[in-house]
Structure formats: structure tokens, C-alpha cells
Amino acid sequence: MSTGAFYISSLLEKMTSSDKDFRFMATSDLMSELQKDSIQLDEDSERKVVRTLLRLLEDRSGEVQNLAVKCLGPLVGKVKEYQVENIVDTLCANMRSDKEQLRDIAGIGLKTVLSELPPAATGSGLAINVCRKITGQLTSAIAQQEDVAVQLEALDILSDMLSRLGAPLGTFHASLLHCLLPQLSSPRLAVRKRTVVALGHLAAACSTDLFVELADHLVDRLPGPRAPASPAAIRTLIQCLGSVGRQAGHRLGAHLDRLVPMVEEFCNLDDDELRESCLQAFEAFLRKCPKEMDPHVPNVTSLCLQYMKHDPNYDHDSDDEEQMETEDSEFSEQESEDEYSDDDDMSWKVRRAAAKCMAALISSRPDLLPDFHCTLAPALIRRFKEREENVKADIFGAYIMLLRHTRPPKGWLEAVEEPTQTGRNLNMLRAQVPLVIKALQRQLKDRNVRTRQGCFNLFTELAGVLPGSLAEHMAVLVSGIVFSLADYSSSSTIRMDALAFLQGLLGTEPAEAFHPHLPTLLPPVMACVADPFYKVAAEALLVLQELVRTLWPLDRPRLLDPEPYVGEMSTATLARLRATDLDQEVKERAISCVGHLVGHLGDRLGDDLEPTLMLLLDRLRNEITRLPAVKALTLVAMSPLRLDLQPILAEALPILASFLRKNQRALRLATLAALDALAQSQGLGLPPPAVRTVLTELPALVSENDMHVAQLAVDFLTTVTQTQPSSLVEVSGPVLGELLQLLHSPLLPAGVLAATEGFLQALVGTRPPCVEYSELISLLTAPVYNQVGDGGPGLHKQVFHSLARCVAALSAACPQEAAGTASRLVCDAKSPHSSTGVKVLAFLSLAEVGQVAGPGPQRELKTVLLEALGSPSEDVRAAAAYALGRVGAGNLPDFLPFLLAQIEAQPRRQYLLLHALREALGAAQPDNLKPYVEDVWALLFQRCESPEEGTRCVVAECIGKLVFVNPPYLLPRFRKQLAAGQPYTRSTVITAVKFLISDQPHSIDPLLKSFIAEFMESLQDPDLNVRRATLTFFNSAVHNKPSLVRDLLDDILPLLYQETKIRRDLIREVEMGPFKHTVDDGLDVRKAAFECMYSLLESCLGQLDMCEFLNHVEDGLKDHYDIRMLTFIMLARLATLCPAPVLQRVDRLIEPLRATCTAKVKAGSVKQELEKQEELKRSAMRAVAALLTNPEVRKSPTVADFSAQIRSNPELTTLFESIQKDTASGPSTDSMELS
């Protein structure tokens, strides 16, 4: 016998002792053993442990009984399945015992065992088998009405089982339903309540037929509002409807037209508890079935408005109320103390249910926001005076919900011609602000902490939606903030909330609004800085930092004299900084606050400046505070006050140098930023020995291992080169070696390249230059020029562009050398002995040098570039076209007419010449292009009918770039082309519009927005190519600048959805030898339409009717391979973004996924077909996994059946598990770049 088994055996022996203390201690020790993962029981030990624990459930000592029942939980996972079933059988038998205590223990035991059973999703069948075993016994226990205690315990356990394992118990659902329905008529309220809960869980998991039976039963049992019926019976049925609505509301949609009018009638009966249940049912219906509730919204809104003010036992005299608001705060507090209170008054529950229902109404119907602002908002504001704390919190919550839905979407763009709906909503909200202030003015000083917290939350949300709207009411807000900051009799939470609100306010309101109130506001903030509770102090330091940053900004003249305040702020902050026993958060906030104080007001610190800097230096030496200290030092160094930092530089620089060796990325990044700021601000004041110490650490940081670190290192090198070039002598060689190696990386980010260009220019810009121009050019070009043979360019294409940019940067820094460089490049480009790589680099360098130093030898250059367009190397041809355009942009009078003439004269080279024109149009200044607009416009539109799609695409891009030259003149001309042009011309014009859209704000946006509706009419064009181009343009707008199209979606979406449908007239059969091949000409258009739908999910979710949207997603799940892949990804996103509508139709959505996952590949399929099918399965299973993250989805019988099918199929199980691991290990890769 092992040591563990022997120990268990000795415990079991003590558990049978006659001494209850022995039994208790032994059972406690067994509990500890069972909780260990390492414990292993043999079969004999299992049997003995189970038998002994079950016997102890009947122990005379209640303490021993309670401990024994707790042991059952960990025991379940340590014994075999038949032992668990033995435990369950015994507990079920004990449930029917005559002894009340034993029945109670058995009930607790069953709940404990059920809670510890492994979920069905893990593949274990234990939970299902155990539940099936006890369901029948629970049913009979519920049906026997002799003992109510047994009934209640059985109903509790049944509810727990159904909530966890509803669907797998499908065979029992009918018997459970028929057992539970009669209990709705039980004379015992507790039985009825537990039955309502159980039926709610059953409704979520049962079959459609049983659900219909349940719904019909509830509807049929509800009497007419005037028919005689027991109020208790009606309340129970309405509560049951509410429970079903909360648990399975997505299945109630089809029954709502019958249910809602009846519930409305009952809501008007004089029974507050019934009214509460009716309103709770409406809330569930609105949240789960917003589409089906649409016809009933006006009536529900009316009921909410009526019952939100339902307070029959209290007289709210509005005239008195207004008069009271003018009284002083002492009278206000007296009135607050005399609040009405009546324990028998239930009307507050009705008001709370109405407020919650109103919040559900707002969140489920954002499309009705204008109506809500007219009807709900004033009513909510009037009810801010609510006397019941819980109700008031829900009223605040409903108004906050309205604010959140009014918040403009990201990237919102107001139209110039007419305000959008978003703008009108904001205007309506702006008109409400004075009313909100008036309603909450007294409440900001309410005795009740929760009320004040609600006010702060509401104002924070309001300031976020309408920045600047609270400025004229600052006196009221400051008064309320100060009141809470000085409230030491309540929890410190209210001070933290007040501070957080003040910090947010400083970020949204203009600084001038705070100036008159600073003498009042600053003392309580200073007191909070010194607060002994670390969270209050940390929050206060953050506020102080924001005060300094906002009231004395560095980019504008000071409008407020800091002299009266700077001493007090400095003293309070330094006191916190000097303390050594502080919480880490307070230390970091104090350091940051000092950084802002010195950076913004250092010139007013006088003699306190040097001690403050020394304190910062001291924190720099401390490992715990060094990162915030580095950031604070950066703030100080970057300050335009140009403070004298000499007292700390000699010691600080070596410390900073040591940080560059630390294996802490955040510290290295912050240190490099600090060093660069110091070098820029202090320049020659930096001690050269200390600078050299820092520089020796830099070569190791210029590496592609971390591009961001490399960029900051190069930026610092540039600054040092400009301020102390002599310090660079020793490290310039190693640094250049690393930098040139970095330039050979094909993944070089634009920021690193720009930093490198700046550094190279700094090297040759010093007098004398740190490194000679010719030497740097040789170093840059050596890897290309020294390449042996001509096996192609050798290096990655991107590397050539990087090297060319650096050559151009050097030429710009040394204008006297540029002409010679250009001549050498032309010679290299035309030399027959030059390799492909040399020619590519020469042309790309000429393109860049031409931009900064002129085009060099004109006639010869044109000839060389034209000849290169006929090169056998594709890389050389592309580089020459690029160079022709870029060089031409620098000398339009000479090059552009020449380029246009060549396009006319050389149709065979048209594609390359159009690429050159595109580069010229993109690189030239718009004003310089104006004289050539008409010629270029005419030439481009002559080529819109090219049969080559690639050519038409380049033409479209050229047209787009040309429009930027004079948008008001050229953009309207698109109308004529769209109306009169041929199909190819129309598609080219629409494609050109796509190139007018960027993800950054642009001056053309308002003008473009006014034309979008006309462009989108092309979705009705008879030509497929035009419709596809329109969808591509629309997708680009939705992805990059959704504000352009948001307000047009009502008109666009029906046309978009039309394009997702399969058109049989576009499907044809093509004979290929003995085989027939099906071609779907509409596939590309459908695919473009589904890509638009995906983009809409990311940026315009609030404008979509999700039920209609899902109809088309459902169709896409059965479409072509490419479209199914798109819709699987969409469905995975929808499962997260819109769980409620997805849940409503999950039974229909899961079938196409099941069909894909279980599809068999045809015999003899080629490898490509096998791979496509495998990827399709994987994508479908990802969608399944995303759906299953919603616990409500798992309750669906169809989903439960498919889950069981996955678990029973080893191949599907492996696939599902691998997807779950991928999801757990990192973010999903199922994102699409559709721009």
C-alpha cells in the first residue's frame, strides 16, 4: 500500500470514530487531500471514501454533515463514473427522506456535485449521464405536492441542471415541460417563482415544437384584462413570459404580435407588482427581439413615460420644486433629510422597471434617436428629482445610454450643405444641457454619495459627447466638485470620482472656463494630494498634472498668471516625491507631475528648480522609479522654456547610457527619447565625455531586431551630429556599418528610412563634414555595384528604393555635388556593361535626385529613359517609367508635353508611359499642373475604353490624381462622363473616384461628399464592370472614410443587398474539350458586395438592420467558395458584435456550417481542391468556435447536436481543438484588408 493510500485509510478509520471531533478533523483532512491534484485513489479506496462520506451525510453532528457534503465536490473529479452515479443515487434517495435536515443536505450535495461535473464541451459524457439519471427522480419529486420543501429543492436543482446542460437533456424536455406547467398554478409563491426560473432555462434549450407549446400555454392561460382571474395567477404568467424573454427571447419573436397587446392591457391594471413584471417582460422583448418589437415601440414608449413618474403616494409639485431650487443649500439639505419613505410603497419598483425598459428601448433602437431626444430625454431629465436611490441610478443610466448612442461615430464628418442626422441629434442634445444642469445642480451636493456619483458619471459622458458644452456652467460644476472633495465623512470613493470627473473636464472644456474658479478649486485638490489613502493621492496628482498642462500650455501665451499657485503646487508635489514609503502608483504619478510642473512652469520655480532637478536625478537612480523619471526628464528637456539642466547633466547622461543596455524595451525607448530631447535643448552644454559614453552604446541598437529602437537611436545620432559633431568621430564607422546593413532590410519602415536620410544629411552637412559625400555615396551603392554577374537585381526591390532615397538625400544636402551625381547615374544607366541591379538603382536614384536637384542633362536623360522602356528586364522597365515620371514632375514644361506626345506616339509602351504620367501627377505641385489639365484630361479619357483592365486601372488613378489639381472644376465633370460614356469609361470614372478617398482628412472631402449619392447611382448600371467598380469604390469609402456614406446607407443598402444574390442568367456552361465547365459571370460582383458588407460591420454597424443583413449572410454561407470564406469570417465577427440577432437565427446559420465541416471531397480530386476544401472547413469551424463563445448559443438543440457530432468525430474534434488553441494564443488572423 502506498503512503497516500495508507494515509487515506487512516483518515477513513477516524471518520467512523464515536468522537465527533475526530470525525470532523479527519473529514477536514480528507477535504485537503482531495483538493490536491496529485492524489490518486485505487478502486478499493474510491469505494471506501464514497461509502464513508455518504454515511457522514447522516451524521448526528451538523458540522460533520456540512463538511462531508463539501467533500463531494472535489471527490467527483477523483473517482470513476459509476461511483459518481452511486453518489447521485444516494443523494436522490435522501431527498425523499422524512428527515428535513437530511433532505437539505442531500439538496446541497446534488448542487455541489452538479457544479463540479466537467462541462459537456470538454467531451466528457459524465455530466450528461448523471443529469439524465436524476432528471426522472427530480420530475417525480416536483410532481408530488405533499412536501413543498422537497419540491423547492428539486426545482432549484432542475434549474441549475437546465442552465448548464439544457440541450443534452432533450429526451426529458417534454416530460419536464408537462411537469413544470402545472406548478405555475401552485398555491405556494416560492414554488411558482422557482418554476418560472426553470421554465425560462427550459425554453432556451427545448425543441421548437415544445417552445411553441409553452408559448401557447402561457398565452391561452392569460385571461382577457376584464375577465375574472386571480391577480397572483396573472402575475406568475407575466413573470414567466419575462423569464422566457430573458433566457430565450430570440425564440419569442413569432409570438410577440399576440403577446405584447395582452401584456400592455395588464400593465394598466391597478397592481404595481404586475406592472413591474409587464415592464420587465417588455425590456426582455426589446433586448432580444428589437425587429419584431418595432410595431409596438410607440405603445411601449408611452407606457415607460407613464410609469416612470408613477408615484401615487408622493406629491411632486412642480411649481414648489422650481421655487425650492432657488433656495440656499441649507434648506436643500433640510428638505433632503425629510424625504418621504414608506416600506409598503411598491411604486418605486414600477418606476425602476420603466427606467430599465427605457434604457433597453434606447439601446435596441438607435435609429429612433431623434424621436427619443424629443420624447424620452425631457422626461428623463424631469425625473432626475426621483426620491428613490435605486430608481434614480437607473434613470441616470437610461440618459447615459441616450448620450452614448448620440456620440458621433469615429471619423464623423459634418456635411457643408446640410446638417446630417448626427449633427441634428447633437444640436438637440446641446439644447438639453441647461436643463440637465438645472436638474442636477442641487443633486451635486446631495447627502447621498451614490447620487453624486451618478451626476459625475452623467456629466462625464455629456462632456465626452459635446466637448465644450459645460464651459458656461463651470461655476455649478466646480461647486459640486469642491463639495465632494471636502466630504471626508463618506467613503473615499466619492473623492476619487470627483477627481476623475475633474480630470476629464480639464480635457474637454476650454482652459479659460477654469481661470475664475482656480482659487476655489486648487486648495481641495492640494488636500487630496496629501491624502493618506494612496488611491486618492494618485488621482489628485493626475488632476494636478492635467491642471498644469491645460491652464499653462506650452504652445500658447499664458493667459493666467501662475505666480499665486506655483509655490503651493510645487510644495505639495515635492512632499509626495520626497516621501519614501509611498505606494508605487503614487511615486510614479508624483514624478510625472513634477515633470509637467517643471516643464510648464520651471521658469517660475526660482530657487526650487535645482533641488527639484536633483530629486528627479535621485529617482533616476532607483530601479523602481527610473522609467517614470526618464519620461519626466524628457518633458523637462523638451520644454520651450529652455531651462538650465547643467546641475544634473554630468551625472544623468552615464545613468541614461546604462539604461540602453537593459533588457527592458520600454526603458530603452524612453531613454532614447530623453537623450534626443536633451541633445536638442542643451546642445553644446552636454559634457563631451558623457556624450561619448552614450554614443558607444548606440551601434548595438541600430539593428533590424527592433526597428522602433533603431529609429530613435538614429534620430539621436542626427541631433548629436548637428550639435556636437566632434563627439561622433569614434563611433561613426561602427554606426555606419550597422546603418548600411539596416538599409538592406526589405522590411525597413518609412520612419527609419526618413531618420536615416536625416542622419546622412547631417554627416555631410557639418563643417568640416564628419564623412565625405563621395565616401557615403560609395558605401551606399557598393553592394549593388560590386555584385558579380547579372543574375537580376539581387537585392529586394524595396532595398533599391531605400538606397535611392538616401542618394537623393545626400544630393539635396550637397547641391554642388548633385549635378555630377546625376551625370554619373545617367552614364551608369545607359552603359551596356551595367548590370540590371546597377541600372535599377541608377533609374530610381535619378527619380529621387530629380526631385531635389533638378533633372540633370535633359536631352540625354529623355533618350536614356525612353530606351530603357524597351529593356528585356521588367525591373529596369518599371524603374525607368518611375524615373521618367518623377523627373518630369520636377520640370513639367519640358517633360510633361514630351510625355503626353510619347503616350500618343507609342501605343505599345502605353502602359509604362501611363505609369510615368501617374508618378508625374502625384509628385508635381498642383499649381504647376494647372496649365496642362485640359490636355491631360483629354488624353486620359481617350484611353478609358482600353480593352486592358490594367491600363484602365492606371488611367483611373491618373484621373484621380488630376482631380486634386482643381476639384471644384473637375469633379463635377464626372457627371457627364457617367451619363454619356461607354461602359468601360463609366467603370474607369468610378474607379478614379476611389483614388480620391484617403484615410486622412482632406480638403476635397466635403465636396466629394456632396457627389457621393450620384456616384452610388452606378450600382443600378446595367454593366457588370461598372457595378463592380462602384462596389469597390463604396468599400474604399466605408473602410477609409465612412463619414462620406453613412447618411446615404438607407438608399445604398437595398442596392448592395441586390448584388449579393445569385443570378442564374449570368451562369453559363463552357465546353473545354470533352468537359463542361460552369462559369459564373456575376461572381466578382457578388464577392465585391460581400466585401462591402464586411467593411460595414467595422465602421457603420449602428446604421445596419441586422436582421436584413443576416438574411444575406445566410445566403452567402451557401454560395461559391470565395464568398463562403468571406461570410464565415463575417459570421465570426457578428457573433461578437451582435450576439442577440445571431442568436435569433442560430439554428438556420449552423446548418450551412455543419454541411461545410462534414463535406467529403470527391474521389480523385486534385491537391488544390483538397487544400481549398480543408481551408473552407477550417474557416467554417472558426465561425462555429466564435458562435460557441456565447453561452446562449450552446443551449440551442441544433447547436448542441452539432457539438456532439464534433466530439464524436476525431477529425472534427482535432480541427476544433486546434482552432481553440489558435484563438487562445493570439488575436484572430481572420481580418480582411478590403481597401
Curated annotation (Swiss-Prot):
One of its GO terms (biological process) is SCF complex assembly. One of its GO terms (molecular function) is TBP-class protein binding. Coiled coil: none annotated. Its main location: nucleus. The keyword ATP-binding does not apply. Residues 314-345 are annotated as: Disordered. Highly expressed in embryonic limb buds. It comes from the Eukaryota. Ubiquitinated and targeted for proteasomal degradation. Probable assembly factor of SCF (SKP1-CUL1-F-box protein) E3 ubiquitin ligase complexes that promotes the exchange of the substrate-recognition F-box subunit in SCF complexes, thereby playing a key role in the cellular repertoire of SCF complexes. Belongs to the CAND family. Binds TBP, CNOT3 and UBE3C. This is Cullin-associated NEDD8-dissociated protein 2. It comes from Mus musculus.
